[in-house]
A protein has these predicted regions:
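Bacterial N-terminal signal peptides
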Residues: 13-23
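Bacterial N-terminal signal peptides that target proteins for export
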Residues: 2-14
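Acidic, polar-rich low-complexity tracts and alpha-helical solenoid repeat scaffolds
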Residues: 4, 24-372
Length: 372
């Protein structure tokens, strides 16, 4: 019998983790205070793994695992397949069960267990079929475990294989670039993504290559410039001239990021187009937050400070309006193509927030008139 082999559309880091540009440290369990050991006398027992499955043979375990997986009961599927792998090493289903156990653990988010199973099947150098698919999934598990260098090594090997299709090589190279981003190697990642797009542009018949991964490469070029944009802080204490230089540089990075996101939208992939629209609106919203929270430079006199605030409010209103326009166009496009993903919901929430800010700004303009 064959393994389950779902499509290998498991893109590393559709990665909403990049929304903050920060990674989270893993929590470690605290060791409990040691207590004096109590001695309990018990009859000797024999460890049999999962006693409830002990009566099932390998055929029954494999069939039950397939049924559980089809019913989306991935924890049960993992139990059946793991039992077969651990207790029936001579089964004709051993290889398929090993791969399927990895799939079930992956679905459960148990990436350490998924990695241990996929590693037994994966062959990134020469594998085909499940061995090739397992290599991609092995890298995926390593990514989720934060072992970026190990994932990059596998994906580099896959991306260099001449026997793979152009789409498979592009997938490996894009996922390598995402791992480089997460590993903080932005320059290396930028070079990787640019090579992907150059290779895609040189493809004789791009219609035969799924645009998902090239669009992801373009999107992550935007992400790299967005991360660089976020790294530039605006400190009014350094003086008006230096603040103006930093603001100009920050605006240049914003426009560079926006340029890559706009190229994604022109590529037409509906997932990454929606994501890019959300990101563009977010850039303007972010710059708005920077400006509105930035204090007036200390060197300005009171009259100069008042003029500064007035000019700042004009710029802020422009940014809010731009964000609203981008968010609205993004939602219109998403509705037109039927896109449904986390970026769509976040766009709706951001649009509502920006509209509320614009209304609040208009009410400030009305206050003097009301007073009169």
């Amino acid at each position: 019998m064959k393994s389950l082999s779902p499509p290998r559309r498991q893109p590393i880091a559709i990665a909403l983790a990049l929304a903050t540009g920060a990674s989270c440290s893993a929590l470690r369990a605290q060791r409990m205070e040691e207590q004096p050991a109590a001695q309990i006398q018990m009859e000797p027992i024999v460890i049999t793994g999962d006693p409830q499955l002990e009566r099932l043979n390998d055929e029954e375990l494999f069939s039950a695992g397939e049924s559980a997986f089809a019913a989306h009961d991935y924890r049960a599927a993992a139990r059946y397949f793991d039992r077969l792998v651990d207790f029936h090493p001579d089964s004709k289903h051993l290889r398929s069960a090993t791969y399927n156990a990895g799939l079930a653990h992956e679905k459960n988010g148990d990436f350490e267990d998924a990695l241990s199973r996929f590693s037994l099947v994966a062959d990134p150098a020469r594998g085909t079929g499940d061995a090739l698919d397992a290599a991609f999934r092995q890298a995926e598990a390593l990514y989720h475990l934060g072992r970026y260098a190990d994932a990059i090594a596998i994906l580099t090997e896959l991306g260099a294989r001449a026997d793979l299709t152009e789409g498979e090589r592009l997938q490996a190279q894009v996922q390598r670039g995402v791992c480089e981003v997460e590993d903080g190697r932005l320059e290396a990642a930028e070079a990787t993504f640019r090579r992907v797009l150059t290779a895609y542009q040189a493809t004789d018949d791009r219609g035969l290559v799924d645009d998902f991964y090239p669009a992801q490469a373009q999107f992550f070029l935007g992400e790299i410039y967005r991360l660089r944009y976020q790294m530039v802080s605006l400190d009014p204490n350094q003086g008006v001239d230096e603040l103006a230089k930093d603001l100009e540089y920050k605006a240049e990075l914003l426009l560079s990021a926006q340029g890559h996101y706009l190229r994604v939208i022109r590529m037409g992939n509906r997932y990454w187009s929606t994501a890019s629209g959300e990101r563009i609106g977010g850039l303007y919203e972010s710059l708005y937050q920077h400006l509105v929270s930035s204090p007036v430079p200390k060197e300005l006199e009171e009259e100069e400070a008042q003029i500064y605030r007035q000019e700042l409010r004009k710029k802020i209103r422009v940014l809010i309006t731009k964000a609203i326009n981008v968010y609205e166009r993004t939602l219109e496009a998403a509705e037109r193509v039927g896109a449904a993903n986390p970026f769509v919901e976040r766009t709706r929430e951001s649009l509502q927030k920006m509209k509320e800010l614009l209304i609040a700004d208009a009410q400030i303009d009305d206050e003097p008139q009301t007073a009169n």
